[in-house]
Amino acid sequence: MARFEDYRVFKTAVGGRLLQLEIGKVCEQANGQVMVKYGDTVVNVTACASKEPKPDIDFFPLSVDFEERMYAAGKIPGGLIKREGRPSEHAILSSRLIDRPIRPLFPKGYYNDVVVVATVMSVDPDCSPEVCGMIGSSVALATSDIPWDGPTGSVKVGRVDGQLVINPTLEQREVSDMDMTVSGTKEAIMMVEAGANEVPEMEMLDAILFAHEEIKKIVEFIEEVVREVGKPKQDVVLYKPLEEIDQAVREYAAPKMREAIQTPDKLERLENMDAVEIDTKEHFAEIYPEGGKDIDTVLYNITKETVRAMILDEGIRPDNRKHEEIRPIWCETGVLPRTHGTGLFKRGQTQVLSVCTLAPASEAQTIDGITEQTSKIYMHHYNFPGFSVGEEDFEVREEEIGHGALAERALVPVLPSVEDFPYAIRVVSEVLSSNAYLMGSTCGSCLR
């Protein structure tokens, strides 16, 4: 073992099973790395960052990849090529699970490229590789020299015979009436993703609090690991608008932006906000000829802070609605003549056309995943074209998959059993106009 001088192993119990972290044995050129072992599940997680900020951008370029290797389950990929190709739907959803809790903890103004890769190398059906990837990403970032205000902990929660269970086994998941993934720090919850069979709200809250107690233990364990093997954090240059520009733009534009944000109609509101931005840029063009990026950033911050303050302090939303007010709803069924079922759902300026197709049960989607081979009798696909927000077409593949999975998770618990209704069901939700209402696809799918 002399060749692995920095190799360290850390162990703890999570959900009654051994969680093992191995650091310093492989991937020595990555900024941060950990091999997570939980049961027989093994996930290698790396974190890498560029040395310099990415020029001419105003966002944080974080990329998260969850890579499934078929050898992890003792399988050879199907098809002619016999090689892993594009990520599966499960891999995309798992990447989003990892991304959501870690993204907010990077410092504001940090524009370096950061890539987190979780590679599933061995799979135990009883030990979730997604949870291993989430914990591993936290460890890799926390022990690296990349600036990050973690760590976070993550668990799954199920409920079997009325008892909450941390990281339920495959057998327990099959009889559980709740499937929840929770991630957080010691102080707060960062992310919740859940599906349940009509579980009351307070019982869901109990499950979140139950998960948080285990998360605190995981975070304390990771903090011990960081104290042992953590690298000093890089001294990085964080982008921040010049204070002089920030103050001047706020004094000039904040009252005007507030008035524009309160416009009830979305299209008119966007036009008014654009007018404020154009006016502000023209006003400061000669005063700060090189301050274009700073002005854009301050205008964005003004908008975000104004909307947040209106909601939290005054209890009103951008179109002057209160918390409990909803936009007018309009529905229509039987929109298309030759389809099996259609529902057009409209709420405010959101329009979603959901189209249902029935087929024999043999048409169910076969999923040959790394954990198990299953068939999906209900499929929900979500299309979000650029014209729905008045823009040129753009690629939103991951978002479409995520929103389709959200609607699918909401509808599956209330569908009839295969024995009572032996048909495959495919629903396609076409977003025709969008105004920030994600559940339009779910509502439209309930129409008939």
Predicted segments, located by residue:
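Small-residue-enriched alpha-helical segments and adjacent helix-cap loops
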Residues: P77, I81-R83, L93, L97, ...
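Glycine-rich, flexible beta-strand/loop modules in the N-terminal catalytic cores of phosphate-handling
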Residues: L18, A30-V115, V120-S122, C127, ...
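Extended amphipathic alpha-helical scaffolds
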Residues: A2-S50, D58, V237-T371
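Short glycine/threonine-rich loop-to-helix capping motif typified by GTGT followed
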Residues: P125-V131, E244-Q247, L432-G444
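Alpha/propeptide regions of enzymes that mature by internal proteolysis
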Residues: R3-F10, V14-R17, N31, V42, ...
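Flexible, glycine/charged-enriched surface loops at secondary-structure junctions
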Residues: K108-V114, D149-P151, I218-V236, L267, ...
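Mobile "lid/hinge" segments at catalytic clefts and subdomain interfaces of large enzymes
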Residues: D145-P264
